């Protein structure tokens, strides 16, 4: 009697989901896996001990086309959500801090600009963020409110052609190294987001030190003290 043998079990894919992936998705997964093996794993121990992540890694990740890879236009790769998830899974296997840099950059900072930003803001920031030339962060979580917008204490008020921003955010990935922050604040018209470039008067992003986890990730406070934000 003829018998057939089952395909070998892969510990990382025991549900055999690989069969449902496209060739492009497999290629992206395998390319990111190789990147992690050569550019992350040999160094992540030192990054953990030093509690740092080299700035030039963002440029390498940009060359890998994983920054904002699920977005279309403005230099973004425009891949499927599945491909993006596979890339993040491979990055996470190397280190959570590296994956955090990528997912905060793409899913939070870049997506917010891509979805709600003006055309000028998109053209200014997204191409540079896709290459890793510019880094973004996402300021929602607060010391007393957590990530609940309904309890948000950060406020912004109109001042001529711009806004004045006051309040503090906490546990913000990429904050200290960010070239632009997407900061959410309560206004008289409701909660809205603001793009706050590095060097904005009254705005600072001190790093949080002595973490027990996610050490190879820059985690920061965001502090607005009458920060002058353009409209």
Model-derived features: positions:
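Flexible, small-/acidic-enriched active-site or ligand-binding loops
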Residues: 151, 199-228
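Short secondary-structure junction/hinge motifs that connect adjacent elements
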Residues: 42-64
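Intrinsic disorder at enzyme termini
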Residues: 1-24, 156
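Mature N-terminal segment immediately following signal peptide/propeptide cleavage
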Residues: 19-39, 43
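A short core secondary-structure module
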Residues: 153, 166-206
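A short, Trp-centered hydrophobic/proline-enriched beta-strand micro-motif
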Residues: 132-140
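Internal helix-loop-helix
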Residues: 62-133, 173-180
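Hydrophobic, small-residue-rich alpha-helical packing segments that form membrane-like cores
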Residues: 146-148, 163, 172
């Amino acid at each position: 009697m003829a018998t057939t043998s089952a395909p070998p079990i892969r510990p990382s894919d025991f549900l055999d989901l690989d069969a449902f992936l496209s060739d492009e998705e497999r290629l992206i997964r395998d390319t990111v896996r190789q990147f992690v093996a050569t550019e992350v794993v040999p160094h992540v121990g030192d990054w953990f001990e030093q509690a740092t992540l080299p700035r030039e890694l963002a440029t390498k990740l940009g060359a890998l086309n994983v920054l904002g890879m699920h977005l279309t236009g403005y230099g973004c790769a425009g891949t499927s959500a599945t491909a993006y998830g596979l890339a993040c899974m491979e990055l996470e296997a190397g280190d959570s801090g590296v994956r955090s840099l990528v997912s905060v950059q793409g899913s939070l900072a870049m997506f917010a600009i891509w979805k709600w930003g003006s055309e000028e803001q998109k053209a200014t920031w997204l191409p540079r963020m896709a290459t890793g030339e510019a880094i973004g962060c996402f300021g929602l979580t607060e010391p007393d409110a957590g990530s609940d917008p309904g309890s948000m204490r950060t406020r912004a008020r109109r001042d001529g052609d711009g806004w004045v921003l006051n309040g503090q955010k906490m546990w913000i990935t990429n904050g200290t190294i960010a070239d632009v922050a997407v900061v959410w604040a309560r206004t008289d018209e409701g909660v809205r987001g603001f793009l706050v470039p590095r060097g904005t008067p009254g705005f600072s992003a001190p790093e949080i030190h002595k973490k027990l986890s996610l050490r190879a990730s820059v985690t920061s406070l965001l502090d607005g003290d009458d920060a002058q934000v353009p409209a």
